[in-house]
Amino acid sequence: MAKNIQAIRGMKDYLPGETAIWQRIEGTLKNVLGSYGYSEIRLPIVEQTPLFKRAIGEVTDVVEKEMYTFEDRNGDSLTLRPEGTAGCVRAGIEHGLLYNQEQRLWYIGPMFRHERPQKGRYRQFHQLGAEVFGLQGPDIDAELIMLTARWWRALGISEHVSLELNSIGSLEARANYRDALVAFLEQHQETLDEDCKRRMYTNPLRVLDSKNPDVQALLNDAPALGDYLDDDSREHFAGLCKLLDAAGIAYTVNQRLVRGLDYYNRTVFEWVTNSLGSQGTVCAGGRYDGLVEQLGGRATPAVGFAMGLERLVLLVQAVNPEFIASPVVDIYLVAAGAQTQSAAMTLAERLRDEMPGVKLMTNHGGGNFKKQFARADKWDARIALVLGESEVADGTVVVKDLRSGEQTAVAQDSVAAHLRTLLG
């Protein structure tokens, strides 16, 4: 017997019971995006490696440790996308979507990072991201945060997520802070772990979100990023906070909040949860006004976010399981008798025409009534339609409520109206 081939470690199959949950959640997210006027863009999974090195930064963990990079048969270095913003910016430049224009875009799909697989984190994972180009005020930053807050309300998880905000200022202000932070860390190297010592000179702001408790205690005495902000960044951040206050969106200013990718400036934010064990980030983003120019386009203000769908699905399942309790099948059509199968399929097609969106499954493969009702139970159907030879002859169908056990014979011409009443 040939050896079974298994899925690659960290790359998960999503089976039918799971995909129904994902579709329900994704549908909710997409509806909210549409209500704000955002348009979908579909991007390649594979990009040229220099795109990510230039966008993300060569001394980030993503580029140094986590990217899936390979040479194709032409000798070109290609990478499975580890995130979506760089590809979205590349597409915007390539197709002339950005300069002197306003764009509100969203995308969804798999991303790839060679990380240690754990609950809610895989090597192939799925992100939904939104990017806005051509707007530089704090009002669009606020709109993106309001959009995400509307998601949480629609999914019933608002009480289980909290918003953290920060401003990391302009590139110049951050460079000044970087020098002050490095000088401080150099005086306390004995407290730093090896990872922080490495980051101290390559990407020192990443030391701020170290999970090491000794390092976190040390950082209480470190220079504060907020003290180094330029006046424009202070004004921008104050404007954002004022808009969120007016909208009733609670937040915490976390001066240690930085993002792991080099392209961010000014606003950064994260929605975090404590409802999945240790604190985890559900959605994160910020402003990246220099990235379009960095990738070869003309200077264009930009802001966006990305959300990991695996973690979001886990959170909805944990705190609001009723949201995803949707049956696979609403109606199961039971047909018994040599002459009934054709009539059953004709009736099923007519009901699908008359009741768009109904989940109706027709029995196939024969079987007596007992076996067919067992199949209806397996699919957790709410209603069974029973069509025997006598029903075919007199143009009726038996409608049975599988929850209450009540049943009634209904003319086939009026069964759709009867079913709408039962299904609500």
From Swiss-Prot:
InterPro entries: aa-tRNA-synth_II, aa-tRNA-synth_II/BPL/LPL, Anticodon-bd, Anticodon-bd_dom_sf, His-tRNA-ligase, HisRS-like_core, HisRS/HisZ, HisRS_anticodon. It is an enzyme of class 6 (ligase). GO terms for molecular function: ATP binding; histidine-tRNA ligase activity. One of its GO terms (cellular component) is cytoplasm. Its EC number is 6.1.1.21. It is found in: Cytoplasm. It catalyses: tRNA(His) + L-histidine + ATP = L-histidyl-tRNA(His) + AMP + diphosphate + H(+). The keyword Nucleotide-binding applies. GO terms for biological process: histidyl-tRNA aminoacylation. PANTHER family: HISTIDINE--TRNA LIGASE, MITOCHONDRIAL-RELATED, HISTIDYL-TRNA SYNTHETASE. Belongs to the class-II aminoacyl-tRNA synthetase family. This is Histidine--tRNA ligase. The lineage of its organism: Bacteria, Pseudomonadati, Pseudomonadota, Gammaproteobacteria, Enterobacterales.
